[in-house]
Amino acid sequence: MGAVVLSGCDKFLDHQPDDRTDLDNPVKIKELVASAYPQVFYAAFAESMSDNAGNKGTAERVDENFFPWKFEDQVKTEYDMPNTYWQACYKAIASANHALAAIEELGNTESTRASKGEALVARAYAHFMLVNFFSKPYNANTASTDLGIPYETKPEKIAVGEYKRGTVQDVYNQIEKDLTEGVALLDNSSYAVPSYHFTRNAAYAFATRFYLFKKNYEKVIEYADLVAKTAAIASTLRPWNTEYVNFSYYVLQNAYGNAATPANLLLVEANSKYGQSYAGYNYGLNSSLLAEVYGAGSNPLNLQLSFRSKVFGGTEVVYNIPKFKTTDIKESISDNFGEPYVVYTLFAMEEVLFNRAEAYANLGRDDEAITEINTYLSKRITGYNPNNAAHKLTSAKITSFYPAIPLKESIVETILNFKRQEFLFEGMRWLDIIRLGKTVTHRSVAGSKDNINITLGPEDPRRVLQLPVEALQFGLEANPR
């Protein structure tokens, strides 16, 4: 594939330093690296595409929810949309690249070592998320021919540069290079508020996700163990069945994205309306999905977990769990209105646990996988008692619940079941759907004003988001439709 020109670069590159000589000391570089995180969140479109989005049939349709639910390409660049996320990721990448270039010019000194590590891991993360939304999921048999996304490693000094899509394999190779090199350089003592930066644990958590996508299960376990061994991870999980279950709506909302919460390994403050809008989306948690996801009959234990009591709203029109607090930030004190910002969790301890459990299961280490899940359940079953047999997950219960599939697969399904409950509204479910090739069906409800019946199988090209119009206009190859 030949070189192409990617428009839209000016939309993020003009926010970067016009003259890199301004980055003439470690403090300035460190400040720039802090902006190397996408400040747009993906949950609005990821949740809408997933099987977490039922049709309520009553609420107003909004573009960031409706278009992804019916798997139609979006051309707008507004709050919480795929095109906006694309731009935010490349803006973050540009910050990382400018910082890395400045570090090189300063001679790669010890004082810039941690910033270099953070920039490399942040660059890897932004590309990882892009390739999984805008390309096919990693498949060792096809990755060398599947279209990737432009992997940018150099800062742009002009508004428009030349880019190549390359292949998914190319992108994954470069992600792994940046990730492994960057992790070795990180220094947790460098940050005033570590939860907003790639600390070692946050980077290790990212590595568990990366290698889970690659199906390198030994690596998943290796990096998960660096975060916390199974025996030690329980104390770092969200205290749903002891504290959260007693919290009021706004107390829970404040706690969920709090930097002091041990479960929050990496947070980002994103320009987003999702926190104030998701409960009212027409395509979201309706009554049938509430029972499917959180009902007692939804899992091998035949128990409701603590989440169920924290589903607020009273009616499916606004069912929600208060995970996102919106803050309006004004650019000037004279402004009447501010821009909405929400703190989102990019990596949590719970994901590390789930990734390790899934890796154990895929390696045939059934007992260790089930032990991992029981550790999780000790913080999710209300009134948990380790001596109560009803509170203990066993292979027999799993097999009974999934009688038609082998134990390994049934353990994985059990993990995905609890993972779906844990991360509802956060976009994680879509990543599992594309990674594992799960089918998604979206149907209109009787009496609704739309008439949609879509079943999206694992090979349906609409599972891959289309590139922004600006990118296509300047020659990047479109994803098939």
Annotate each predicted stretch with a short phrase.
Residues 221-350, 380-401, 412-414, 422-428, ...:
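Hydrophobic-face positions in mid-chain alpha helices that act as interaction patches
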Residues 9-54, 294-298, 384, 437-481:
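Membrane-proximal, proline-rich intrinsically disordered regions
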Residues 9-10, 200-238:
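Aromatic-residue-lined binding/catalytic grooves and analogous aromatic/hydrophobic interfacial grooves
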